[in-house]
């Protein structure tokens, strides 16, 4: 059964398959390239950075905030990723929210995004984030439905983004 877990090197092969799927836009550290992560050592560096990013003193790009990164996996099969941002900047308040998520294209329309968001809410609550701001593009009907099914209450639209507050508890 798929579950949210901390990033792990155990899904390296499946992660590489996912990031090569057309339409998938993975996110990684500015100084790492996909070519670096095809090697186990480079991927281990990426995983370590993902895990360290939740710490306040971790190095990060300007404007970024501490975030807990989680991967949605079924055994060694990588399905998607989710990030919980520990606080909101003015930009995140308008555009990004507390939680951002992606499902690999070959696994979309199977309920994974809904399960990921549902499983992430207790993680957010443990971080003291309640309610959780989740945003989506105005035209992204599937994501809007995911947020609404999780109990998201629509607040407003800003800059082409729909903004919802989702109870974490």
PLM regions and their residue ranges:
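Conserved active-site alpha-helix within GNAT-family acetyltransferase domains
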Residues: 114, 138-156
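Conserved GNAT acetyl-CoA-binding A-motif
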Residues: 124-135
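Conserved acetyl-CoA pyrophosphate-binding loop and the N-cap/start of the following alpha-helix
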Residues: 107, 111-119
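Active-site acidic-Proline motif in GNAT/NAT acetyltransferases
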Residues: 101-110, 139
